[in-house]
Structure formats: C-alpha cells, structure tokens
Amino acid sequence: MIRPLHLSMAVALLCALAYLLGGRPASAQHQHTVLTGQAAFTDAAHESPGIRRHLTVADLPAPAPQESVDNGPKIVPRPAGMLPIAPKGFKVELYATGLDNPRLIRTAPNGDLFLAESETGKIKVFRGVSPDGKAAQVFVFADGLHQPFGIAFYPAGPNPAWVYIGNTDGIVRFPYKNGDLVATGPAEHLADLPGGGRLRGGGHWTRDLVFSKDGTKLLASVGSHSNVDDSDSHPEEFHRADVLEFTPEGKFIKVYASGLRNCVGEAINPITGELWCSTNERDGLGNNYPPDYITHVQEDGFYGWPWFLYGGPSGGIQDPRHPGKHPELQSKVITPDILVNPHFASLEMLFYEGRQFPAKFKGDGFAAEHGSWNRAQRGGYEVIRLPMKNGRATGEYEDFLTGFTLPDDTVWGRPVGVAEARDGSLFVSDDGSRSIWHVSYVGSR
C-alpha cells in the first residue's frame, strides 16, 4: 500500500525541489570552469557544489557606503528531511543535534571530536558513530569557561599532554591524555587576552589557538573591538586585530602579525608550516566590498586594518573613514591569497590530510562561511574548498557544501567549524540548526 506523505515531509520535498530547480544553477554547468571577474560575485541562491570562483583585486568595485544594509538572516527550523548539499559521490549525515551554540570543532589524536559550546561555557567530546550515524557517546569535558572557542592539543603527535582552550579573555589549558572524556584536573590560566563582547559590526570575541609546526610558538588570534575604529585613539584596540605569539607556557613574545581585522580561524599548512588565517573584513563599504579573505600569514606582516584595505597599486588603499592616516604603512599592506565573496564571514578552516576523500583533495583547504548580514543579497552559508598546488593557493575557491538557505531567503543552517575525522571524513558544526554534520565520500574513485 502506498502511504500518503506526511505534510511536513511533503513541504520539505517541495521546498528542496524548488530550491534545486529555482534559484540555483546546476553545478555541472560550471564544474569545469572558473568564474572570474563580475561573474565570480555571488549570493546564496547561486552557490552550488563544484562551482569555482576566482576574485582578484582588479575585480573589486569602489567603496560604496550608501549600499550598506543591515540584513541579518532570519533563522528558521530545518525542514524535515532536508540535508546540506554536497558534491556528487559524497554523503551527508546528521552526527549530533540539539546543541547549544556549537562553534569551533577539533579532532583529538585518538579521533574524539571536541566542540566549543561557547554560549554555555562548555567543551564537549563526541566519540564514535552509532548505527543511525549519530555520535555514540557525548560528554562534557569542561564547563564554567568564558566563551571558549579555540582548541589545541599539545604537544603534536599521538600522545598530547595538554588541551589548550582559547577563552574570550585568556588562554587556559587542562591536563589531557588520549581518551580522556572529562578533564582530570582544573584549568591552568596561562595568559590574559583582550576581552570580547558581542556587537553587530564589532566586538569580536572568538580566540582561536594553534601551535607552530615545530611546537615552539602558541599563536592566538584576537579580532578587533570595533568595525573600524582608529586604534591610535581607541585604547581598547590594543593587541586586537592581531595574531599574538606566546610560548607554550603562556609567556607573551610579540605581535606575530597585525592588521587582520578578525582572524576567526587559524590553521598550519602541513606542507609549508605557514600559519593561515580565515578572516572577516570590515563592514559598511558596500555590498561587494571588501571581500573576506583566507591567506597565509607572514610573520611581522601588516594586513591593513584599520587604516588601509588591501589591493592598491602601492600596497594599501586608504579606508575612506581614515583619510591621510599612516602613509608610511601604505606600501607594507599585504594582499591576501584567496579573496572570498564580501561579507561571507569566513570562520574555521583546515587543510585536508586524509585519504577518505578522492586524492585530488589532499592538501586542499576547507573553510566554513557563516553567512552575511551586511549585504543586500544574502551570501555565504556554505563550506568552501580551497584548491592548493604544492601548499600554495591558486587564488580560487569552490562551493563544497551548500543548501543551508531556502527560496524565501530564510536560513536554516550556518556553518561555523570544520574538522577532519580520524578516518579522513569531515565534520561541520552549524549553529543555525544547532547541529554537527558528517560528510563522507561513498562514490567511485
């Protein structure tokens, strides 16, 4: 007997069909081309797995402050049966749901998945996979933390002794050995960081942590206190919009790199050993200006904030809100490696080292795009792939995991974190649907 579809399932199927056939181009149309120039600018309705884009500074419009809008997403429940959309050959499963503000995720050497539930001040641990695809076990590793975000295991290798946590106001660590599901000792405070706060267009509170490849440097990213306040006259911007270098014991060494407005996600390129940042650029200059970016970070490098934007013939372009400021720095502004569409809010990133995905993915990057609010046409809300050649960016990026928005311009999912599972599959945290997704390759090779 054929049973009638449940109404919610029918609505979900119709919604998904409309989404696929309505506002979204077929990815096959662009799988073998790279969109450049004005064609590379996009919105969520035209994001689809397999589409590649290559934005350059020559493609960028002039600043247009009059275009700026406050267009935050309307978050709605995930329609029943709806999943993120991955490239052909990939399978997406729901790994965990009902979470409270799931943010950054990192995989421990033994394969356990650590999650920062920033709003509740908790670090959770997920272990294994049940027959239904969900996590087999979930534990609270630690709580009572201050908006935790960054997670790093030290030393590198199969037997770490510590797990470091980036609170919004400092760095702490817990004793840790492989397999620990609950902290076996209290948090040890190592260093203070400038305190955070949640403000639209500023007050960036996330603090990511990574160790250099040789293990001698602890690098902490600290976003700006404001959208674009002049740090000369705003002391609250001290040691913000920077990557700060510490020893593993928490001794401050120096500002490792500056002018990075909000480096939310850090990663070490395993081939080159270089630090990379996934960075949110400033707001208020127009729908398509300036692009967010993902880049390798030069030690002692300057990336422009707040006085300059990247991409000028002499280095930087003066931010129109800071005319004439610091001309001596203009030539020092570094142009990033990968320009992502403007206001996409690029968050956690990683470099893929596994073998579960096809070989062409080895060494490429992935980054979570949380989605725009300062743009008339909503964009982002996806995970992107960052093609690499011998550890160097090609400048392109590719839509990888999409489908988090609906045809009526509402949003059901917002990717935040990406982590590689021990078997080489991918986890994606999503604070829109309060979930973690599991992406694996099941196609032919």
What are the residue ranges of the model-derived segments?
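Beta-propeller domain segments
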Residues: 33-87, 160, 172, 206, ...
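Asp-box/WD-like beta-propeller blade repeats and closely related beta-sheet repeat scaffolds
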Residues: 137-138, 144-148, 152-154, 161, ...
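Beta-propeller domains
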Residues: 83, 110-135, 179
